[in-house]
Amino acid sequence: MKHLISTLLFAALGAVAVPASAEGLDIEVSGIGDAPIAGLKLYSSRFSYPDQPRLTERSGVYDGNAEFHFDDLAPGDYAVVVWADKNENGEFDRSMFGNPKESYMFSNNVHEDEPDWDAVRFTIGGERTQLKLVVSKP
């Protein structure tokens, strides 16, 4: 009976443990201006970019700056786009011709309408990853 309780306790603790391979990502964004919200889309593979982000987040803007923090990301290649969400709709708005309507920046501080995955990808692995992006007008 004692062995059964020990086994069950050990199994329960193992079920809630965070995987050792989980990594973190911190992103500092500046140049947002007077937009009240910054939006971010995080992509986790070449195949999902740019149409299917792994997640979309929003952050409040203070003095033209915003921060995003992510924990428990699997090691690998990622890309992000951040934008000044002036109309607070949670979307990276584009014109009917596909051009960005809001100030934005991709990872690696790439400022193109639709950059290639290789231009914007960065690798998470080892230590916590830090990105600093400066939003620019379209």
Predicted regions: what they are:
Residues S6-A15:
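Bacterial N-terminal signal peptides
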Residues A17-P19:
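N-terminal signal peptide c-region/cleavage motif recognized by signal peptidases
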Residues G24-I32:
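A short, amphipathic beta-strand motif
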Residues D34-P50:
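Short, ordered, surface-exposed loop/turn motifs in non-cytosolic proteins
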Residues P50-D63:
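Short, acidic Ser/Thr/Gly-rich low-complexity loop/linker segments typical of extracellular
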Residues G64, H69, A74-D77, E127:
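A glycine-anchored, Pro-Gly-centered beta-turn/N-cap motif
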Residues Y78-V82:
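A short tyrosine-centered beta-strand micro-motif
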Residues D85-R94:
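Acidic, glycine-anchored loop motifs typical of Ca2+
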